[in-house]
A protein has these predicted regions:
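C-terminal/domain-terminus segments
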Residues: 12-28, 45-48, 134-143, 147, ...
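Conserved acetyl-CoA-binding loop-helix of GNAT-fold acetyltransferases
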Residues: 120-123, 128-146, 151-154
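Short alpha-helix
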Residues: 184-192
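Conserved acetyl-CoA-binding loop of GNAT-fold acetyltransferases
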Residues: 191-199
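Short amphipathic alpha-helix that is part of the acyltransferase structural core
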Residues: 2-94
Length: 261
């Protein structure tokens, strides 16, 4: 997709401007460092994302945003264009992995997109608590509008779910805060911006590894087979010593924003 000219935010928001990697390829390394900084190591080893990341950065450089405050990256957005069915009940259980593969295959087949799928929004540590998560989400919607796309679809990773790994996602998403809004801060952002929570994608990312790899990724020991809670995982991981295999299956939540012209 073609890129757009960076712009300056209104005075009511923290002063920032937006640049795509198409416009600022020199930001690639810092953009990727910022994007990876918020994740536990194991989240960087989804084989579908790893296999397609280079193509996505090449094909969709105009859809990778850096929100800049001066010469510092305050937040990064990674998203991909793709064709989706307007019957959102058909959004698949495989979430992120589906969107990554479909965006690449749609592009290579010349299929015209009607939606953007957000892969991640990461706010740099220095700028957390300054409303950049909401600002970045608005930029995603604005980006879709500029390119005349109908929808923004997101397999959302709820911010606080990792604190409750034994609670099923189906229960967690219905928790409310005292104001009657979603308990989870990230789901609240989308709710306030008009997003519709559609369904759970139970197998959004599937991350396999050997027991040794899981030890390296988490810094934990796994002396027996079974289910283990690891920091920042939304569900327990499964360890099978006999097969020398660890497996993490990440659930996310499909949220859709309808883009108005």
């Amino acid at each position: 997709m073609p890129s757009e000219t960076p712009h300056v935010a209104s005075s009511a928001l923290p002063p920032y401007h937006v640049a795509t990697l198409y416009e600022r390829p020199d930001l690639l390394n810092l953009h990727q460092e910022t994007g990876g900084s918020a994740w536990p190591e194991f989240m960087l080893h989804d084989p579908v994302a790893v296999a397609n990341w280079g193509k996505m950065m090449s094909y969709f450089a105009g859809d990778q945003l850096s929100l800049l405050v001066g010469d510092k990256i305050a937040a990064v957005v990674n998203m991909v264009p793709l064709k989706v069915d307007a019957d959102f009940g058909k959004l698949p259980d495989t979430g992120v992995d589906w969107g990554v593969e479909k965006s690449v295959s749609d592009h290579e087949a010349g299929i015209r997109p009607n939606a953007l799928m957000g892969l991640q929004i990461v706010v740099a540590k220095e700028f957390r608590g300054k409303k950049f998560s909401g600002i970045a989400t608005r930029e995603v919607i604005a980006h879709a509008r500029r390119h005349k796309l109908e929808f923004v679809v997101l397999p959302v990773r709820p911010n606080e779910k990792h604190l409750y790994p034994l609670i099923p996602m189906a229960d967690y998403i219905h928790w409310k805060n005292p104001q009657g809004l979603p308990f989870d801060s990230w789901l609240r952002v989308h709710k306030r911006l008009g997003g519709d929570m559609i369904s759970i994608c139970h197998k959004s990312m599937i991350i396999p590894g050997t027991v040794g790899e899981w030890g390296d990724w988490t810094g934990q020991s796994f002396p027996g087979s079974g289910r283990y809670i690891v920091p920042f995982a939304l569900n327990p991981i499964d360890i099978d010593l006999e097969r020398d295999r660890g497996l993490y299956v990440e659930p996310n939540v499909w949220v859709v924003h309808h883009v108005t012209v």
